[in-house]
């Protein structure tokens, strides 16, 4: 039987050494599922609530024992006996139990851990891999990796404003070949940086965090690394950015502080458009502040026909904010982070709403991760076609890539790679 027998949570540590929630769900037929919850560094103000203990004497206030207790008492009691294969009902029960718009009462980290573990348990009970359980027999598209090879902003202790400089190996037929390409570029970039006298220490997401002279220098060294790895920029490999503009936007003045310049919204749009003219940039995430809808509209009008414009802090995996973007013609893609909204059901709802309206979706990690690889299965299950899960270092990032390699092997000849489809979309 797929009825929930028991739910247990514990406090574990994420990739930054901060506490996070891990949940285990056991069904009456003996099947079990486990999931761990990620955590972000640059978080949008509209995200679901991550419940921390706040006791500064323990883990500097970042403990999650309250969230763990909520799982082991209130949530466990409410869900016992429910059918794990009815994910929507399970998630709705937790939403109603919490009773707040942003899951502040129980904590989105408590609710999400259970939601993901329930999906894993149901998949195990039905003897299916998670991607097939969630996506059905037609789930066979491997996502193009957005490989974060230079970290800046909130993800690194350096002078680079842009949070992530990524490479996207799109011009390949198989995911495994694309992953090899990105990895080879990463290793070549290490030598390029070392030869220039820069540090090759890595940031939270496994990319290098050199103290470069400017954001543009980051683009230049990446172009050099692509060439030295033997690949062609703009034909096989493209560049993607996560500006995380909210982090350098002053709401009182309406100015963006970038490269030691104060820019208006119009100037920010022109600045990003200029980069797209000079470099093979295929995607820009959070190019504007999370609530600067006016500048977002201008950016979409200017370059949205040739560049993927991704809403992360803008949409926070929330169908209401995404619907506003759709209605107003703002952005053309949504970043999917399970902990921004807090349940598997709401995450899938956001992906499906995006796809119905011609928006792309990207399954994404957070800067604070664990060995949990749920987002890899989710990317294949929902045919997102793209995944953002860090660089070619740190085992918390490799866990997702390695899971995708296993899925590709399992699918065999049926496997598709999403890179060429996305390349066609941006090149026409």
From Swiss-Prot:
GO MF annotation list: magnesium ion binding; phosphopyruvate hydratase activity
UniProt pathway annotation: Carbohydrate degradation; glycolysis; pyruvate from D-glyceraldehyde 3-phosphate: step 4/5
Residues bound to (2R)-2-phosphoglycerate: 163, 337, 366-367, 388
UniProt-annotated location(s): Cytoplasm; Secreted; Cell surface
GO biological process, one term: glycolytic process
PROSITE patterns in UniProt: ENOLASE
This protein's GO CC annotations: cell surface; extracellular region; phosphopyruvate hydratase complex
Main location: cytoplasm
Active site (catalytic residues): 205 (proton donor), 337 (proton acceptor)
Enzyme Commission number, as recorded: 4.2.1.11
Enzyme class: lyase
Co-factor(s): Mg(2+)
Keywords: Cytoplasm, Glycolysis, Lyase, Magnesium, Metal-binding, Secreted
Pfam families, alphabetized: Enolase_C, Enolase_N
Presence of keyword Chaperone: no
Catalysed reactions listed for this entry: (2R)-2-phosphoglycerate = phosphoenolpyruvate + H2O
Free-text comment on the cofactor: Binds a second Mg(2+) ion via substrate during catalysis.
UniProt similarity note: Belongs to the enolase family.
Known function: Catalyzes the reversible conversion of 2-phosphoglycerate (2-PG) into phosphoenolpyruvate (PEP). It is essential for the degradation of carbohydrates via glycolysis.
Protein name (database record): Enolase
């Amino acid at each position: 039987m797929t009825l929930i027998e028991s739910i247990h949570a514990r406090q574990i540590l994420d990739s930054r050494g901060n506490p996070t929630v891990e949940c285990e769900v056991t069904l009456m037929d003996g099947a079990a599922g486990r999931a761990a919850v990620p955590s972000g560094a640059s978080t949008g103000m509209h995200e679901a609530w991550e419940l921390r203990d706040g006791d500064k004497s323990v883990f500097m206030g970042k403990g999650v024992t309250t969230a763990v207790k909520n799982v082991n008492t209130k949530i466990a009691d409410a869900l016992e006996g429910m059918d794990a294969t009815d994910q929507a009902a399970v998630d709705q029960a937790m939403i109603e139990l919490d009773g707040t718009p942003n899951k502040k009462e129980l904590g989105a980290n408590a609710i999400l851990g259970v939601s993901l573990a329930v999906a894993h348990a149901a998949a195990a009970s039905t003897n299916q891999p998670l991607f097939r359980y969630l996506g059905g027999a037609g789930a066979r598209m491997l996502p193009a990796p957005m490989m974060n090879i230079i970290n800046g902003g909130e993800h690194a202790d350096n002078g680079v404003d842009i949070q992530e400089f990524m490479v996207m190996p799109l011009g390949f037929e198989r995911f495994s070949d694309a992953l090899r390409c990105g990895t080879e570029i990463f290793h070549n970039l290490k030598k390029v940086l070392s030869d220039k006298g820069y540090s090759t220490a890595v940031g939270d997401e496994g990319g290098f965090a050199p103290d470069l002279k400017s954001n543009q220098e980051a683009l230049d060294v990446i172009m050099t690394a692509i060439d030295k790895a033997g690949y062609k920029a703009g034909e096989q490999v493209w560049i993607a950015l996560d500006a995380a503009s909210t982090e350098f936007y002053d709401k009182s003045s309406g100015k963006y502080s970038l490269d030691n310049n104060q820019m208006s919204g119009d100037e920010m749009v022109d600045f990003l458009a200029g980069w797209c003219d000079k470099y093979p940039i295929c995607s820009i995430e959070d190019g504007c502040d999370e609530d600067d809808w006016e500048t977002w509209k201008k950016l979409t009008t200017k370059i949205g026909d040739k560049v993927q414009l991704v809403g992360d802090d803008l949409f926070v995996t929330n169908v209401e904010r995404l619907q506003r973007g759709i209605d107003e013609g703002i952005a053309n893609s949504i970043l999917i982070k399970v902990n921004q909204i807090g349940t598997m059901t709401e995450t899938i709802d956001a992906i499906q709403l995006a796809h119905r309206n011609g928006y792309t979706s990207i399954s994404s990690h957070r800067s604070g991760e664990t060995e949990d690889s749920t987002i890899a299965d989710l990317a294949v299950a929902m045919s997102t076609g793209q995944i953002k899960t860090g660089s070619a270092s740190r085992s918390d990032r490799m866990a997702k890539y390695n899971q995708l390699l296993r899925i590709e092997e399992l699918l065999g000849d049926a496997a598709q790679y999403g890179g060429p489809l996305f390349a066609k979309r941006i090149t026409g």
